[in-house]
């Protein structure tokens, strides 16, 4: 079954991770809840860090034919092996931005949240795969380079190893290479 397939790979991933290593698992609504229980069993509930909601598209076309709520997001579960090692990323404040009280902003910018958008309207935090984009491969579980760059940036440094057990078209390896990470891709 699918859970056995996942269990075998997740146990190997846990054993390969360094103490400050992390794991990100992309799932849709069909399997996310089963996989969360499995990950809690393998990594320990205390090592669950965050559920990231990735809005995957716009509500249009065939999606509107759904008989109930229209699905418009996938989930990425974020776990650590033992110690959290995380590089926080910020979206810079727009030029000329001032706070409500009239003072200039403090800090590096807007901290990226755990809901990642794919909307052209929300330029601030948009990670999208456009329908006719060259980056679109046709894989149902495709992640674009911006999404993978965000994950790899937050979890690794130059020279670290990135592993993808479901490498598909190889986008994870391409992004890891551009970011000067080592990578292992399995399909």
Predicted regions and their residues:
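Conserved acidic carboxylate
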Residues: 187
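Class I S-adenosyl-L-methionine
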Residues: 1-161, 165, 184
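Conserved SAM-binding loop of SAM-dependent methyltransferases across substrates and taxa
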Residues: 171-181
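Class I SAM-dependent methyltransferase "Motif I" SAM/SAH-binding loop
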Residues: 166-170
């Amino acid at each position: 079954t699918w859970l056995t397939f996942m269990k075998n790979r997740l146990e190997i991933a846990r054993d390969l991770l360094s103490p400050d290593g992390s794991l990100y698992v992309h799932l849709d609504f069909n399997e996310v809840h089963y996989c969360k229980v499995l990950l809690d069993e393998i990594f320990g509930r205390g090592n669950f860090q965050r559920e990231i909601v990735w809005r995957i598209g716009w509500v249009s076309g065939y999606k509107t034919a759904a008989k109930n709520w229209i699905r418009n997001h996938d989930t990425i579960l974020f776990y650590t092996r033992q110690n959290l090692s995380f590089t926080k990323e910020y979206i810079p404040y727009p030029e000329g931005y001032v706070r409500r009280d009239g003072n200039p902003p403090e800090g590096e910018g807007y901290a990226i949240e755990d809901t990642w958008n794919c909307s052209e309207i929300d330029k601030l935090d948009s990670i999208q795969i456009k329908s006719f984009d060259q980056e679109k491969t046709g894989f149902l579980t495709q992640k674009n380079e911006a999404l993978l760059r965000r994950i790899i940036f937050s979890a690794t440094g130059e020279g670290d190893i990135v592993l993808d057990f479901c490498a598909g078209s190889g986008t994870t390896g391409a992004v890891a290479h551009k970011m000067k990470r080592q990578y292992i891709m399995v399909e």
